[in-house]
Amino acid sequence: MRITVYSNDGSSSRQVADKLTNKLINNGFTMDAQTPEVVISVGGDGTLLSAFHRYADALDQIRFIGVHTGHLGFYTDWRDFEVDDLVVALQEDLGQSISYPLLEVKITYADTNEVQHFLALNEVTLRRYAATLRTDVYIKENFFESFRGDGLCVSTPTGSTAYGKSIGGAVLHPRLEAMQLTEIASINNRVYRTLAAPIVLPSDEWLLLKPSRTSDYVVTIDQFTFKDRPIESMQFKIAKERIQFARYRHTHFWDRVEDAFIGSKHEI
């Protein structure tokens, strides 16, 4: 089995990554950062997001494992003190995995008609620097609304527990093949109206944004930021690709939600 260990730059994460790498080598595993079959992320959810984008072109050949060195994350199933148990699980590997949906984003630029394609594991946002975002919103071919406000966020089910939740979005179970559109401080008055509620779209529908002609847009795709390009349109749909996680043990999704946002049931 070809494995790579992908770590953030924190000292504790580097120590765990070095320890894990040495144990993997000593147990006969092949370390291969170019064409891995398993990518082990050491850090938190942000580190796993970075690992996902690093290997996004080979998702059909890779399973991910998350080792967290801080707080419990939604993508990390192993703690930093469980390195020995993880190595044993890898030795007993039977190829078991669980997959989650991803978001496919197509951005068409107004100045050059250039088209860029991206995958997102968590969410995509569209804003302007310091002015109101104005964009027409289409669901499939049908016009839905004209949005005015600070911005819009489109998230995956797993991303629904991240930024989307903080702006009033619903929490979606990752078994749902769906994406969610959430407004960021929309303007609603006698002149301008939006739905003013999150929208959940199934996998056979897509979302199209056609913003006003200006160049001061800020687009975020997971942890990446793109600025200062005039955007003709942005199209969102559930991607054909999926992210695969090695399933040696898997924390129940609602247990993750409860632990992250409510606190231990045993403390009540």
From Swiss-Prot:
GO biological process: NAD metabolic process; NADP biosynthetic process
Keywords: ATP-binding, Cytoplasm, Kinase, NAD, NADP, Nucleotide-binding, Transferase
Binding site residues for NAD(+): 45-46, 122-123, 148, 150, 161-166, 185, 223
Cystines in this chain: none
Cofactors required: a divalent metal cation
EC number(s) given by UniProt: 2.7.1.23
Localization per Swiss-Prot or TrEMBL: Cytoplasm
Name of the molecule in the record: NAD kinase
TM helices/strands, residue ranges: none
Function (record text): Involved in the regulation of the intracellular balance of NAD and NADP, and is a key enzyme in the biosynthesis of NADP. Catalyzes specifically the phosphorylation on 2'-hydroxyl of the adenosine moiety of NAD to yield NADP.
InterPro entries per the UniProt record, alphabetical: ATP-NAD_kinase_N, ATP-NAD_kinase_PpnK-typ_C, NAD/diacylglycerol_kinase_sf, NADK
Family statement drawn from the similarity comment of this UniProt entry: Belongs to the NAD kinase family.
Enzyme active site: 45 (proton acceptor)
Gene Ontology MF: a single term: NAD binding
Coiled-coil blocks: none
Organism: Latilactobacillus sakei subsp. sakei (strain 23K)
Keyword Kinase: yes
CC annotations in GO: cytoplasm
Gene symbol of the encoding locus: nadK
Reaction equations catalysed: NAD(+) + ATP = ADP + NADP(+) + H(+)
EC top class, as a word: transferase
